Curated annotation (Swiss-Prot):
GO terms for cellular component: mitochondrial inner membrane. Residues 138-175 form a coiled coil. PANTHER family: MITOCHONDRIAL CALCIUM UNIPORTER REGULATOR 1 (PTHR14360:SF11), PROTEIN FMP32, MITOCHONDRIAL (PTHR14360). InterPro entries: CCDC90-like. Key regulator of mitochondrial calcium uniporter (mcu) required for calcium entry into mitochondrion. Its main location: mitochondrion. Signal peptide: none annotated. The keyword Ion transport applies. This is Mitochondrial calcium uniporter regulator 1. It is found in: Mitochondrion inner membrane. The keyword Zinc does not apply. The gene is mcur1.
Length: 262
């Protein structure tokens, strides 16, 4: 029997899946990179089956090692497929060694229940010691911090009170200054109103004086104009008289020359 047929029989015996890929020796798996050597898909199936059986039955313990398949049945299967008894025992011993190595690798990262309980007790003791340390710190340092915080709170309250007092004083002084400025502004406004009233009265008096002066000036002008007009009329009459006398005189002289001439 060839090595390929031997590998096929081993894979078929260990898987027990009845996959059609194992129906013929050398058929291989079409999803593998090495179709005639190893099927990684079926290897993963075998590994998951091994892990499941290991977790379910708790095979690997501190008492002893147990295997999840019957070595005698595998030997009989190999002998039924043409292997000799010596070859079958060698193959089964190789499988046992491989399983032991795999189990050791798997159980390196695992712990027993007793170890888990010991670790839990250690963790609980550490937690208890931490609690004790926290209680000690709370009694010593935390009390000091609490007293310091109380002092700071008292100082802050005093500062707050001083600040409120200063704010009240500033508000009172500002209010007093505001009232003084308000009264001063009112007085200034009253003074300005009084001055404005006096100015208005003086302006009214000036206007009245100007009106009186204008009326008097108009009257004087009217009297002067009437006097000038009367003088002009009198001068007119005098001029007319002089002209009439001079005209009559000239006529008289002219008549006298005319008579003398004739």
């Amino acid at each position: 029997m060839s090595r390929l047929q031997l590998r096929f029989l081993l894979r078929r015996a260990l898987s027990g899946s009845g996959c059609p890929r194992y129906s013929m020796p050398g058929s291989g798996c079409p999803g593998c990179f090495l179709p005639r050597v190893t099927c990684f898909r079926d290897f993963n199936i075998i590994t998951s089956t091994m892990q499941y059986n290991l977790d379910k039955r708790n095979i690997y313990t501190s008492v002893g090692k147990h295997y999840f398949f019957d070595t005698h049945a595998v030997v009989q299967l190999l002998e039924a497929n043409g292997f000799s008894a010596e070859q079958s025992e060698i193959v089964v011993s190789a499988l046992v060694k491989i399983l032991n190595v795999n189990m050791n690798l798997i159980h390196k990262d695992m712990v027993t229940k007793e170890q888990q309980e010991i670790s839990l007790q250690q963790v609980m003791s550490l937690i208890a010691s931490v609690k004790k340390d926290m209680i000690i710190l709370e009694k010593s340092e935390f009390s000091a911090l609490r007293t310091q915080n109380e002092k700071v709170k008292i100082e802050l309250q005093q500062l707050k009170k001083q600040l409120n007092d200063s704010i009240v004083k500033v508000r009172a002084s500002n209010k007093l200054d505001f009232n003084l400025e308000k009264s001063r502004v009112k007085e200034m406004h009253a003074d300005n109103e009084r001055k404005l009233l006096e100015l208005r009265t003086s302006i009214v008096e000036l206007h009245s004086q100007q009106d009186r002066g204008l009326t008097q000036t108009k009257r004087k002008i009217d009297t002067e104009v009437s006097g000038v007009k009367t003088m002009q009329e009198s001068h007119k009459l005098d001029t007319i008289k002089y002209l009439a006398g001079s005209v009559f005189t000239c006529l008289t002289i002219a008549l006298g020359f005319y008579r003398l001439w004739i």
